[in-house]
Structures are given as C-alpha cells and as structure tokens.
C-alpha cells in the first residue's frame, strides 16, 4: 500500500512517532494505529500492514494529544496532551511478529495517568514528559512528568492506580533571594521550569540524576536514589551557578546518548531562533555537577521553533540526534569532539567540531508539485525516521553485508492546506556506524578501505626456492655464461624482493614500536590514576574511621541523655522536637556506621585489583619480532656466497 494514501488521509492534528526501528505509531481522529514494513519500491514508499489498536479505555474526543512518547523497547506508549496523559501497553505480538502475520486489529490496555490531579486543579497543565530508559526493578518502570506548578512527579507505569512514586518540588528554588522584608516586583513575569531530562543510571548502580532548566536559563540538579521511591522522601535540589554564553529563551533540554557515559554526560539546549547549545556535564566528588558549554550552532532561520525528533534506530541516536525546523530536517553528529574529549590518547585533539547534515529539504521544486511550497506554520515539521525492509535493497546495496536503509520522512502542507510529504533514503553500512567516515545524504556512499600490502608471512611463504644453476663439461662456454647470467638475474630479483620485504618488516617494527610506546604512556597514565585513586580511598577511609569514632561518642551521649529522662516527666514541645531530631541523628549515625565497613571492603578490592594488574605487567615477556628478519638475512648471505662461487668458476672456465 502506498504511503501517499496514508499521508492524504491525515489531518492537521495527526501525531506520528517511531514505535520500533521498523514501524511507526500515529494518533489521528481519535484513533491509534501502527504501520509496519516500510519499503522503497522504485522511489515510491509503501507499507506492508496497518494495525488498528483497540484501547481498553477510550480516549475522549475533546482530548488534545500533541506528542507520543515511546519507551526504549516500544512496550509502553504515553499520549501526552496539555490536560491529559494516557498510557498504552503495546503487546509483544506487534513488536516481534512479522508484518504479514499481524492482524488488522489488536487489543491494547490503556489507562489515564493521574487524571485526578488534573481534574482537581483546572489551571494545571503538562509541560514535559520523560521516560527512564532502564527499569528500577522488575515491578517498577518510571516516567517523570513536569507540570506547570514547577513540580516533577514520578510514576510507575506498571500500576494503573496509586502509581505516584515521588514528587520533587522546585518552587522554593526558583528564586535565589528569600528575604521577606524585601518586596520583589517581577512585573507580572515569574520564573518557571520549561524543560528537564534524566541522566540514566550507570550499570550496577541504583541512582539517576535530574537536570532541569527554567525560563531564565538557570539550571537545577537533583540526585535521585531508587530508595526514594520506596521511602517517599524527596531528594535534595542543587542550584547551579549561571552558565555564561547561553541564550535567555530556552525551549527544550535533551540528554544525548553517548558511547562513554561514565566520564561525562552531554545535553543539547534548544533555544529560540534555532540556537543549539551542547553542554558537557561533569559530576564532582560532592554529587553535584559542573557545566561546560562545548559549542553553539545556529540553524537556518525558519518560521517557528525547532523541535528534536524522536528516534528508535540505535545507529542514529548514539552521539547524534535529529532536529526539525519548519523547512528542513537536520542530523547533528557530536561523535568527533566527544570521542576526542573522552580519549586518553596523546594524539587526540579537542579542536574537532560538530557535524550538521541536512537530511530533507522541504522546498519542493515547482515542476514536481506546482501547488506545494514549504510549510509556513508556527510549528516544526512532522518528521520520522524508519528502517526500511532489508530484503528489498538494490543490487549495489546488497554488496554491503551489514547495510541499513533509513527512510527520513517529512510531512508538510501545500497552499490548499492538504498534506504532502518528502522523503530521503540514506544507506549506513558497518564502516559508517563504527568509524563515522561518511555523511548523511541522498547518495551516501561508503569510502573504500585502504589498500593493504598483505601479510608479510604470506609473502614469505609464497617465495619458492631458486632453481639450481648446474654447469657441466658437456655444455659450451656460451651456454654456461648464458645460464649463469640468467641465474644472476633471478638472484637480483630475489634480492630486490627480500629488500622490499625487509623494508616492510622495518615499517611494521616501527609501527609496533610506536604503538608500544603509546601503550606504555597509557599504562603509565592508568597507573598514575590508580595511585591517585588509591590515595584518595585511603584518605577517605581515614576520615571515615575518624567520623566513626565521633559517631560512637555522640551515640553514647545520646543514649545517656535518653536514660536520664524519666518517662513520666512531661516534656515541652521544644524538648519533644529536640528528642525527635536526636532520634533522626542517631539513625543517621547508625547508617553511617554500616557504610564504613563497606568502604573498607571496596578499598581493599581496589588494592587487590591494582596488585594483580601490576603483577601481570611485570611477568609479561616481549616476543622476538625480528626472528623473520634474521632468517631473511641468513638466506641473503647464502645467496651471496653462491654468487661469489659461481663468479670464481666462470673466471676459471674463461681462462
């Protein structure tokens, strides 16, 4: 079925988002549909199957849906509107089954998310919704919602009722001055949070972070532990010092998935006027963050504000993202400077820049669509990227064993208000995805690999022994001289070949030597970092033991104080409050006492691993890399001896 018919049937309020790398989900006219199996048949886009999702809870016709948020695996879908939030659970048969085996209709569970909060407060609205990529546990799948009351609320999507886990209130932190004696006049304008995003938890950790931004471009961070959801206490909020050089009209803040998130995190700040600011966030030893503005880009001027496009294709969302304006769809690649930033190689440089490629231009030539111009509305293009079916690739693309055909589809409007579409197909192979040597484009072609000289061992094995030059008495003098000259020519050719191979061996040895030197420098830097970390752990352990002693003394004093107080003696409110505070401190001291042995075990484990690494490096034996060169030198000497012997025989024969 042609995708043109699908585009023509969409209304101006249709919302389209990728569900999986090979399928999209569309909400339009109070219906939720999934389209799978996209192919390119002679420059005409087609889809294989249309699946209508029958929801258990019908979405009201008056509900306005402006965005669809999809989980990492596509099993949860959130329909977001200014005054509504609906959660849809997608069945596994839609995500796994082949397109031709899917039914035309499929039942899905649907339920509203905290609708009572929106019904009780008429002025409350939804600002942003974010999903935590990883589950906290088997029964908790977390989503965060920013409401207009400057509160971020966390919900468990696996619960229909009582799904609220935690609420983080930023209202008391939006204003730096809290002096009641000073009257603050904001002239009717008040600060409010405009966007936020989550830093996913690292492997084998049980915490994540929140980075939020308000209308004055001030940042706020919070460190959330999974235990906060169970115990119900809000985390501490840190206000970040103002970052210089950022625009004062922020629109959206997004976390960018990178190849090495352990060292730092990268965010993109979308501001008015099409300005993109890439922020590198470094955590410090106190659990806070330090912001660094890496670079800033300005997209071509267009009507409306740019919008980041969701993507489910891994090769297009790691160290890169897509952003749509009212006239074009762009791909932004931060891999060059991020790889240089996180690399410890001495040859790396930090002068590399962000790469921006235009995927689709919404200006259609007049000879193709005479009634179509670029979209002139106040919002960004509706864009989506989907992986095409691999089996229908062209003959040239089949030569690449691990190639992917990605369709970038853009939906716009013509003069008559009817929907139109443009698309671009890019081919990404294994070379592009690993080395990032090609760029986005309609005619994207991978660069050929460098010409290899082959294995030196194979070249040596291919050399056959020279035929013996036998001169008997029955052979005439001229024939003997001719045979000897041919043998000398063969010897010269063999000598030249051995010289070339020797040069290649020398070049390889130099390359190995330089690599070994670079590896040695890396090992020294790692050793230095291990020593620094070990010293830090030792200092921390000493401080922890000192703290433990102080805690023991404080605990004894608290216990003595508790025993001195008679239970029948009435206490004042201040005394009761003091004793409650003392109990809290006693609990905190007990928790800190439990942490000291754990820190000791961790430090001992680091010592043990460092000793193992040093022992392995000390017992390593260097292989003899010049054995083949010595063997070739011996063969060359034998050939020279045979040549001298033949010269002597020829001189005696001529005499």
Swiss-Prot record:
It is found in: Membrane. Pfam families: Nup88. The gene is npp-24. It comes from the Eukaryota. This is Protein npp-24. Keywords: Membrane, Transmembrane, Transmembrane helix. The chain crosses the membrane at residues 263-283. Disulfide bonds: none annotated. GO terms for cellular component: membrane. It comes from Caenorhabditis elegans.
